[in-house]
């Protein structure tokens, strides 16, 4: 499997020494160097990509059974990627189509995808950083997409070892300037031959027209308006040039505190309720300024809270929910479960897998995010309340929660175009700091927090539990997570729309120079061929049938709320237990004196949530209506395709969901074939039908983690450690003792 091998040392686990060391002498390698070089794969460079350093006579370890095997070749480092060029080691040198990325090869690592670099010195594994006095004999690279690469440098010339190791460390770990990113080199070199997919209708939300269209789509244009007060970013560099605010709000209010303290519209529900977000005002000590802020917020609150017609519930996600530090700490522990260097290390951790998983708290954080989104959905759907999300800059957890709420409530967001437009609206235009949160510049490790990856994991839970409700697949989500680290797309490499426009040459540009044309990640034709793109689309998804005008007229008298939910009695505004006026709740939150736990009755909120949650799950699911996930402990699962795809021992050959999907596609093809014959008889012509990917037609040749892990050329024979079973202390259990020595090679 790609990137797997056994390292002698590291983590206290010693694997067997390489079998080929006893049979291949360094002299023989150098003698045959010319012959081997002829077989090497050619280095393909993207426009603007430059070779920085390289080393020959490098062995890349490939795990095969319980032994070690190596592939001979060159290790190179460019200003875009680290690449290994050796003999063709494809597991399937055949006619079968593979799910290949046109930008990144299976032995390529973009510089931004490198997580940690280790060196092995005398059987000891050490983290590499800065200037080295001594260079390792083995190089181990852990990637952010969970690949693990191991290279033996024992036969490489000393000068080449120094050059390649120092180059890789410097270009992956040293702080960078934004303008030094490969993104700009590529855009400059490929400016004339950049192509875009004409079928990509993703709404980018970079024009006033896009926001007006979204208001009209959600029927929010009766109460909200799109404004251009920040055009040219003259009010606030953090906000997009265009956004939506409540209609009664004067535009001069937006300018008063540079966009802080302003309710910005996210989405409107069919019953008239809306989801809003707001960034907190700067904390002040001066009583005079505090009074001005209080008066300002009082006017803002009266704009959005008009009892009894419109009631606003505030959710402070920065103080009463999750902290960014919690997310980062949990993910750091969680990812270590999947970055194993060899089979022995994998099986050693297998016996304590669940305890390690639980101690990371990552799945619990996912559950808490989904629960919070359901709570907000209940307020909007069942109680017809507006919800205002509060956060310091409204660009992290606000993005996450508002996106999840829209996924649950709006079926349009569950289409591929709708989902991409949602990310553009809430994350890209919402000012999520991708550059800092992904630490692309390596300038501040403390700012690195995988908020967007947490969002994708939450979305995967929904996709996994309700597959027919989504037009896209888990494979789509996986390649989207990988695209975070490919610096030819501008989508995930800026902190704000202003930063992007300023560095593209759109602000203060020369008359002769024209702005750079940066690619968007939503143009999937850049990464995948059309046949591979079929794996991004869910064949089980069925679009909602469109009603004709006659049917629409007949349904106008019906209430717009989902009929599958129980009708609840109208409820008064939330209890006020500390302040006389609800407006003080908002003011206290935004002025930094947050005590919202004392305001709302937790018992009432819990009862409302449980009633709403249980009632929805007791009914049959309308995949084109409201969609709620199960959030009980066992229902929140590990996203196996993303986290386990490079671990051979974690795969089920010919099994898993891919086997089920294969059978379903066979049935669909049969139905389509019959439909074609019927259409031929009626219309005397053949109607073209979508064809299932050929790779799915024989599930016995596929892995459960398809399409990233196909049937391996060599069988895998895991050696189960006896130390783990002895730790159980039950030596009389014959079954357990026998299982230690079961040979799985012939199964």
Curated annotation (Swiss-Prot):
One GO CC term on file: membrane
Family per similarity comment: Belongs to the protein-tyrosine phosphatase family. Non-receptor class myotubularin subfamily.
One Pfam entry name: Myotub-related
Composition-biased stretches (Gly residues): 1-14
Phosphoserine modified-residue sites: 564, 601, 716
Keyword Thylakoid assigned: no
Protein's name according to its UniProt entry: Myotubularin-related protein 12
Subunit architecture: Heterodimer with lipid phosphatase MTM1. Heterodimer with lipid phosphatase MTMR2.
GO biological process: phosphatidylinositol dephosphorylation
InterPro entries membership: MTMR12-like_C, MTMR12_PTP, Myotubularin, Myotubularin-like_Pase_dom, PH-like_dom_sf, Prot-tyrosine_phosphatase-like
Residue span of region Interaction with MTM1: 449-558
Domain Myotubularin phosphatase: 205-643
Localization in the cell: Cytoplasm; Sarcoplasmic reticulum; Cytoplasm, Myofibril, Sarcomere
Keywords: Cytoplasm, Phosphoprotein, Sarcoplasmic reticulum
Species assigned in the record: Pongo abelii
Purpose of the protein: Acts as an adapter for the myotubularin-related phosphatases. Regulates phosphatase MTM1 protein stability and possibly its intracellular location. By stabilizing MTM1 protein levels, required for skeletal muscle maintenance but not for myogenesis.
Positions of region (Disordered): 1-21
């Amino acid at each position: 499997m790609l990137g797997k091998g056994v390292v002698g040392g590291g983590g206290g686990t010693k694997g067997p020494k390489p079998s080929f060391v006893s049979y291949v002498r360094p002299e023989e390698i150098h003698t045959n160097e010319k012959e081997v070089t002829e077989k090497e794969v050619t280095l393909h460079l993207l426009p603007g990509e430059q070779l920085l350093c390289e080393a020959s006579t490098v062995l890349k370890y490939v795990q095969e059974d319980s032994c070690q095997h190596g592939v001979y070749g060159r290790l190179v480092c460019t200003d875009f990627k680290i690449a290994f060029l050796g003999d063709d080691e494809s597991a399937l040198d055949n006619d079968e189509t593979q799910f290949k990325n046109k930008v990144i090869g299976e032995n390529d690592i973009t510089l931004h995808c490198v997580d940690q670099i280790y060196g092995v010195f005398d059987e000891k594994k050490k983290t590499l950083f800065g200037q080295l006095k001594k260079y390792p004999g083995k190089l181990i690279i852990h990637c952010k997409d969970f690949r693990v690469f191991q290279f033996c440098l024992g036969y490489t010339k000393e000068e080449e070892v120094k050059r390649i190791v120092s180059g890789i460390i410097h270009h992956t770990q040293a702080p960078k300037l934004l303008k030094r990113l490969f993104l700009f080199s590529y855009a400059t070199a490929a400016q004339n031959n950049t192509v875009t997919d004409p079928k990509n209708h993703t709404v980018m939300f970079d024009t006033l027209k896009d926001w007006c269209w979204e208001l009209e789509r959600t029927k929010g244009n009766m109460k909200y308006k799109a404004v251009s007060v920040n055009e040219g970013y003259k009010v606030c560099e953090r906000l997009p040039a265009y956004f939506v605010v409540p209609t009664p709000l004067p535009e001069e209010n937006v300018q008063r505190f540079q966009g802080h303290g302003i309710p910005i519209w996210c989405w409107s529900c069919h019953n008239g309720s809306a989801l809003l977000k707001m960034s907190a005002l700067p904390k002040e000590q001066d009583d005079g300024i505090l009074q001005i802020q209080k008066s300002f917020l009082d006017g803002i609150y009266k704009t959005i809270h008009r009892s009894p017609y419109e009631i606003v519930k505030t959710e402070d996600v920065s103080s009463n929910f999750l902290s960014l530090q919690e997310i980062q700490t949990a993910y750091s522990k969680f990812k270590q479960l999947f970055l194993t260097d060899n089979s022995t290390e994998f099986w050693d951790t297998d016996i304590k897998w669940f305890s390690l998983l639980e101690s990371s708290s990552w799945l619990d954080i996912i559950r808490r995010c989904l629960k919070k989104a359901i709570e907000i959905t209940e307020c909007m759907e069942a109680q017809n309340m507006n919800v205002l999300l509060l956060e310091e800059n409204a660009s992290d957890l606000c993005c996450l929660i508002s996106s999840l709420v829209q996924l649950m409530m709006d079926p349009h967001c569950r289409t591929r175009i709708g989902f991409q437009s949602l990310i553009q609206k809430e994350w890209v235009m919402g000012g999520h700091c991708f550059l800092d949160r992904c630490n692309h510049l390596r300038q501040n490790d403390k700012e690195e927090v995988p908020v967007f990856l947490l969002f994708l994991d939450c979305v995967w839970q929904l996709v996994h539990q309700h597959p027919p409700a989504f037009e896209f697949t888990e494979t789509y989500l996986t390649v989207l997570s990988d695209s975070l680290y490919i610096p030819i797309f501008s989508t995930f490499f800026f902190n704000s729309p202003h930063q992007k426009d300023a560095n593209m040459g759109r602000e203060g540009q020369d008359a002769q120079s024209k702005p750079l044309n940066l690619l968007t990640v939503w143009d999937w034709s850049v990464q995948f061929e059309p046949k591979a793109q079929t794996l991004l689309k869910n064949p089980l998804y069925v679009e909602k049938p469109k009603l004709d005008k006659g049917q629409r007229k007949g349904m106008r008298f019906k209430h717009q709320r989902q009929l599958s939910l129980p009708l609840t009695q109208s409820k008064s505004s939330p209890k006020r237990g500390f302040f006389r006026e609800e407006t003080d709740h908002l003011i206290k939150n935004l002025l930094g004196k947050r005590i919202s736990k004392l305001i709302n009755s937790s018992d009432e909120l819990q009862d409302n949530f449980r009633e709403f949650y249980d009632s929805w799950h007791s009914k049959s699911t309308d995949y084109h209506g409201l969609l709620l996930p199960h959030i009980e402990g066992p229902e929140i699962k590990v996203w196996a395709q993303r986290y386990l795809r490079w671990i051979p021992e974690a795969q089920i050959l010919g099994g898993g969901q891919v086997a089920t999907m294969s059978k379903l596609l066979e049935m669909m093809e049969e139905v389509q074939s019959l439909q074609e014959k019927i259409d031929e008889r009626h219309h005397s012509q053949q109607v073209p039908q979508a064809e299932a990917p050929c790779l799915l037609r024989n599930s016995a040749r596929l892995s459960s983690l398809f399409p990233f892990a196909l049937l391996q050329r060599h069988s895998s024979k895991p050696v189960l450690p006896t130390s783990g079973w002895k730790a159980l202390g039950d030596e009389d259990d014959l079954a357990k003792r026998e299982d230690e020595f079961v040979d799985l090679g012939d199964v």
